[in-house]
Amino acid sequence: MLPSWTIGLLLLATVRGKEICYQPFGCFSDETPWARTCHWPFKLFPWAPKDIDTHFLLYTNENPNNFQLINITNLDTIEASNFQLDRKTRFIIHGFIDKGEDSWPSEMCKKMFKVEKVNCICVDWRRGALTRYTQAVHNTRVVGAEIAFLIQGLSTKFDYNPENVHLIGHSLGAHTAAEAGRRLGGHVGRLTGLDPAQPCFQNTPEEVRLDPSDAMFVDVIHTDSAPFIPFLGFGMSQKVGHLDFYPNGGKEMPGCQKNTLSTIVDVDGIWEGIEDFAACNHLRSYKYYSSSIFSPDGFLGYPCASYDEFQEEENKCFPCPAEGCPKMGHYADQFQGKTSAVGQTFFLNTGDSGNFTRWRYRVSVTLAGKRNVHGYIRIALYGSNANSKQYNIFKGSLQPNARYTHDIDVDLNVGKVQKVKFLWYNHIIDLFHPELGASQVMVQSGEDKTEHKFCGSDTVRENILQTLNPC
């Protein structure tokens, strides 16, 4: 519940349409372009910093489990902490009805410590986020100003380069990061938007929302981009970065179509279960990012005009072009062409659980046999690292000497493909006991374009495996 003086201030702002100032963070207007962005009948001011009560929780490799509280108006707390000036600093900013302490941001920090030396600051603005959505939208402006104030202080007092800062924001946190980046003139090194919030931000002016000018490099993961009305998509669909990733098309994530009960029981804790059911697609963005820290190669994004084109048989978006494909998530900034243009779109498919990783291959099967058969053909890859399960390549009329091609997303990194196993079946009783085989199987890796050719000389009855070796 808001303090009475704050309610009075908001009512006054509604009538007078002026600005409110919170020193040392500057002034905040309720006029265009911030007014009525949500079709809300009242103009709103952001709450005062003391009411939002933002906490900056510093975790480092030296204190991965217990944070050190940073006071942004007293940078002696930086000197007294484990903050290291020779390391990158990653800020992780939660979104609406969320928190930064004892939640996914601190868990993400712990994963980072396994792969790098880094300062990891969780921005906990839960009091400003646990209110009605439209008010939380405006509160992001103050939180963004506070983040910018801290980064500017690090630069001024310690000569810390803003290019070494990476802002990571989920939902409303993405636009909070954008506000911070904008206040710093876009000089922050990197900004990652994890399914930036759609309501109040979609198709608004750039100064209101996340856009590519907010940092030197902006990468975005879209996972819940269906229209808010009528589909209740919480994330933006429009391109707002240098690299915009749309896993699974950016709207419906695998594993998010379960029934209410199974979703709630599947996860740790009843509250997390309810939250996961209500916003499963929206939350996938930070889960994908977190998983990418350990498994970067399993989140390769392919440049493509649309998801439909990406899913087409023998699509033109496969394999990766000469300049390569970016890795969605933690290592997206390693992509050579990351800032060559804004609004570059990339597509990929993910798994429905676990670490969500997938490796894409194009498989072409040439059949051998004596007669046409109606049924299914499947292929398993056997590699230097692991062996895959059987993947469907085609169903329908199977014709000897015909070639069937399909792109598959393998759920583990098999390494170098050393052999393949072919299987066909039709589940129909056939008194003639037909036989089919694969005379040739071509397997191409999406990442490095390498092709492997396998040959066979046999035919087999249905549900009998045929092994093909290199030729």
UniProtKB/Swiss-Prot annotation:
Identify the metabolic or biological route this protein is part of: Glycerolipid metabolism; triacylglycerol degradation; Glycolipid metabolism
Which residues, if any, are the signal sequence? Answer: 1-17
Active-site residues are S171, D195, H282
Q: How does it sit in the membrane?
A: Peripheral membrane protein
What controls how active this protein is?
A: Up-regulated by CLPS in the presence of increasing concentrations of bile salts.
Q: Give the GO terms filed under biological process for this record.
A: cholesterol homeostasis; fatty acid biosynthetic process; high-density lipoprotein particle remodeling; phospholipid catabolic process; phospholipid metabolic process; triglyceride catabolic process
Query: Its function?
Result: Lipase that primarily hydrolyzes triglycerides and galactosylglycerides. In neonates, may play a major role in pancreatic digestion of dietary fats such as milk fat globules enriched in long-chain triglycerides. Hydrolyzes short-, medium- and long-chain fatty acyls in triglycerides without apparent positional specificity. Can completely deacylate triacylglycerols. When the liver matures and bile salt synthesis increases, likely functions mainly as a galactolipase and monoacylglycerol lipase.
Q: What is this protein called?
A: Pancreatic lipase-related protein 2
